[in-house]
């Protein structure tokens, strides 16, 4: 059976190899007689799965040893509270608001610390990014929060900001939920990174947190123990029962990522090349069209989430119906911005983008 191409923004498509391996191991993982879903999280079988997943993620992302990797629950939305509960010390936090997700983040953080919006792209309707040189950063801020890829508006920081160069000693907190593992990360610029797995790493249910060790141990007294980073780190993410099956699928995805090759590049470097090629193909098709529009500035277009509008919005339902008939699924844009959105995460093959581009051209010719 040929599977359709799923352009969902998340939960998103998973590598077919991963799904097939999980299916083969569903009833009996490696001769254990158990499904992973049935295992004790403290048994040797699951401990092996967890340790391999953590080691593979560290290797893939080239995460230095002075960072802890935590497998948590609650998704990126919960991290909007968990981060200030752990590292704000009840003080100041600066936020760069570039779309829906960073806006949600700053609103949530206000419950726990003094929030300042250091920069925003609201005047451009979230279609550009405020240059770092214009950010109004406070010298005594506990941290600076940036969403490095806005899933809804389709804007992405092509490089991480260098806070030290901007005169700030605050740790940079990045929400990389929707582009984690799509490109390398310069960890010298980062204090803490978090991301839900359900876009690029696995199913919903597990949240990856990468936190510098010096940021541990400063949680507010009201922080729930299950969300205290130091407690989670000290217990190897097993303080409470972790989302075992989601961690298992994420681990299979890490192994799949390690196998990726693009020329001489492997792993995340190969994935970045692959993602750049997919994004270029789709943006070129939109830009050379007379029917479709992408309003995001070219210097900050997301490689993962490509929103676009039809100039004649009365054709939207026809477009979506035709796409579904061709096996191109979940292209409807977010309700807050309308139009269409193609999410082309790591697991989306080039063939999927080629099929979408072919349909874009076919639909335009039909309705020219």
Swiss-Prot record:
| Protein's name according to its UniProt entry | Phosphoserine aminotransferase
**Phylogenetic lineage:** Bacteria, Pseudomonadati, Pseudomonadota, Betaproteobacteria, Burkholderiales
Q: Which InterPro entries match?
A: Aminotrans_V_dom, Aminotrans_V_PyrdxlP_BS, Pser_aminoTfrase, PyrdxlP-dep_Trfase, PyrdxlP-dep_Trfase_major, PyrdxlP-dep_Trfase_small
Gene3D superfamilies in the cross-refs: Aspartate Aminotransferase, domain 1, Type I PLP-dependent aspartate aminotransferase-like (Major domain)
Keywords from UniProt, A to Z, are:
Amino-acid biosynthesis, Aminotransferase, Cytoplasm, Pyridoxal phosphate, Pyridoxine biosynthesis, Serine biosynthesis, Transferase
| N6-(pyridoxal phosphate)lysine sites (modified residues) | 199
Keyword Oxidoreductase attached? no
Which gene underlies this protein?
serC
PANTHER family annotated for this entry? PHOSPHOSERINE AMINOTRANSFERASE (PTHR43247:SF1)
What family classification does the UniProt entry report for this protein? Belongs to the class-V pyridoxal-phosphate-dependent aminotransferase family. SerC subfamily.
